Amino acid sequence: GVFCGEACAQASCSIAGCECIAGLCYKN
């Protein structure tokens, strides 16, 4: 649930432990 400070166009994020949800990277 914490925003990782990165937008994403695909399912993966460049920041480790973060996942793409609704176009933005979140971690827990």
From Swiss-Prot:
The keyword Disulfide bond applies. One of its GO terms (biological process) is defense response. It comes from the Eukaryota. Keywords: Disulfide bond, Knottin, Plant defense. The keyword DNA damage does not apply. This is a cyclic peptide. Transmembrane segments: none annotated. Disulfide bonds join C4-C18, C8-C20, C13-C25. The presence of a 'disulfide through disulfide knot' structurally defines this protein as a knottin. Belongs to the cyclotide family. Bracelet subfamily. Probably participates in a plant defense mechanism. This is Cyclotide vodo I1.
